[in-house]
C-alpha cells in the first residue's frame, strides 16, 4: 500500500504542469477518482486507475481538490480527479417557497448552489432519498423540478 500524506500542489501549477505533461506522454500519470463526498475526507483508502493500492492520510488543514498532486517523482505521478457531480435542480413557486426550500436545505446540511432562480442540491446519495424528503413541497406545487 502506498501512503500519500501530503498535497504537493495542483496539476495546474506551472512548476508541476511541465513535469506532469512529460510523465503523461510516458503513460506514467495515475489518477485517483473521488466522489464529491470523498474529496472532503482526510483519510481514505482506494485504488488508482492503474490498480495501485493507496491510502490518503492528510492533516486536517489540507483539503483535496480536483487536480491535487499527491505523488510526483521521476517515474510516476498520482493526481486526484473529481468525479462528475450530480445535482437535483429545483425551482420554487414564489419567494415564500424559495425561503422555505432554502431553510429546509440548510437544516438538512445539503450543499447547494444557485443558477438563476433554480436551487441545485448536490446529490451525495440516491436522488430518491432527496425527493422523499422534499415530497410535501413537491406534492403541493411549492417547489417543482427544473
Swiss-Prot record:
GO terms for cellular component: cytoplasm. Keywords: Chaperone, Cytoplasm, Nickel, Nickel insertion. It comes from the Bacteria. One of its GO terms (molecular function) is unfolded protein binding. It is found in: Cytoplasm. SUPFAM superfamilies: Urease metallochaperone UreE, N-terminal domain. One of its GO terms (biological process) is protein folding. SMART domains: UreE_N. Involved in urease metallocenter assembly. Binds nickel. Probably functions as a nickel donor during metallocenter assembly. Belongs to the UreE family. This is Urease accessory protein UreE 1. It comes from Pseudomonas syringae pv. syringae (strain B728a). The lineage of its organism: Bacteria, Pseudomonadati, Pseudomonadota, Gammaproteobacteria, Pseudomonadales. The gene is ureE1.
Amino acid at each position: 500500500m502506498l501512503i500519500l500524506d501530503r498535497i504537493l500542489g495542483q496539476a495546474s501549477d506551472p512548476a508541476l504542469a511541465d513535469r506532469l505533461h512529460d510523465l503523461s506522454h510516458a503513460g506514467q500519470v495515475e489518477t485517483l477518482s473521488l466522489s464529491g463526498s470523498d474529496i472532503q475526507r482526510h483519510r481514505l483508502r482506494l485504488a488508482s486507475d492503474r490498480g495501485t493500492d493507496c491510502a490518503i492520510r492528510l492533516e486536517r488543514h489540507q483539503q483535496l481538490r480536483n487536480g491535487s498532486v499527491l505523488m510526483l517523482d521521476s517515474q510516476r505521478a498520482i493526481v486526484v480527479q473529481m468525479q462528475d457531480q450530480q445535482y437535483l435542480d429545483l425551482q420554487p413557486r414564489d419567494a415564500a417557497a424559495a425561503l422555505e426550500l432554502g431553510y429546509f436545505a440548510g437544516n438538512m446540511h445539503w450543499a447547494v448552489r444557485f443558477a438563476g432562480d433554480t436551487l441545485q442540491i448536490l446529490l451525495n446519495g440516491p436522488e430518491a432519498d432527496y425527493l422523499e424528503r422534499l415530497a410535501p413541497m413537491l406534492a403541493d406545487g411549492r417547489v417543482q423540478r427544473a
